[in-house]
Amino acid sequence: MTSQWRDLLPQAAAASSLDATSDASARAAQFAALQTGSFVSLASDTGLIAVTGADAAAFLHGQLTNDVERLSSAQARLAGYCSAKGRLLATFLMWRDTSADATIYLACDADVQAAVQKRLSMFVLRAKAKLTDGTATHVLLQVGGPAAEAVLANTFPALPAAALAAAHATFGDAPTSLIRLPDAGTARALSRFLWSVPVTHAAEAWAALTQAPGLTVVPPALAAWLDVHSGVARVTTATQEQFVPQMVNWEVVGGVNFRKGCYPGQEVVARSQYRGTIKRRLHLAHASGVQPAPGQALIETSDPDQPCGMVVQAAPAPDGGYDLLVEVKLAAREADDVRLGGADGPALAFADLPYEIIDPTETPASSAAAS
């Protein structure tokens, strides 16, 4: 970490802290920036694993749920890492840069990064692949809006035009990547990006963004609201080994390739898909009260002794309460009387995801045909 960014990091972290939004008008301005304006958020809740070596792609291809060998630098992909029982240990956004060693990056929840990186490293064996902490070399920023795009245009000749498209450039003498994030449905019509900034130039990038007219700094806890509305689940420590990928719509959003070779848990994932045994799915919902925690149980009032699902992730909503992604039994969702934490807990008000949940007996074209 450069001394300049080390000196600036406390200031950036303070500006990105949820405590900085205790003022109601400030929080309203931040949500306005998320919904219709320009913003930057220090993605301190996201970890990054860098994978290098001649066998990096082949190694990851045999470990993850999606095709890594045919991952081009022009695109990013979602992928999962499963246990032998087919349960997700981590969910990734992955991309390959255009540096000489074509480094592959895996962005995941910060709390699971170290353990997952260590576990993956155990299986490298004789493969020419090395996993390192990507946060030591790059800072992740979530950005969006015209003011942010004007800053990005100084580094990237063309911005990614479609969800999960990627662009690459050189910032100073270091590689930098820009990924267009999945759309956030009705929460935001404008595009948003994940910018992987070389730590050697992080202070410069942060200053350019935060000094841009019309751009608002937003805490990651609020920026997570857009992640919730994208319907792309994030596995955290509290939810590791709780879900087969289909339970969180991972194959629907393109995170599973059913035509690639084997990986840990592949037989379970494939059997669940083709036998139509998935009876739980990811849904978008709203709840009042205190902030829901990942892993918190959901209860159907007609069967209060047996949880019908759990919270995957949650974020504050603009008009109060919290929007959340929940994994829930299909039957309980249809009954539409699900509560948070107990039969007397806050009721969930379900909303539409920005994509259609495909029947589990059908192989989504986006997953099967990924290349």
PLM regions and their residue ranges:
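Short, conserved active-site entrance elements at the starts or edges of catalytic domains
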Residues: T216, P220, L226-E251
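Glycine-rich, small/acidic residue-mixed loop/short-helix segments
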Residues: T2-W5, F92, V248-V256, A270-S371
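Short amphipathic beta-strand starts and helix->beta connectors
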Residues: A26-T36, Y81-L93, M122-A127, A169-D183, ...
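Residue-level recognition of beta-strand microenvironments
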Residues: D97, G134, L181, G231, ...
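Acidic, low-complexity central loop/insert segments
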Residues: F39-A43, G47-L48, L93-S230
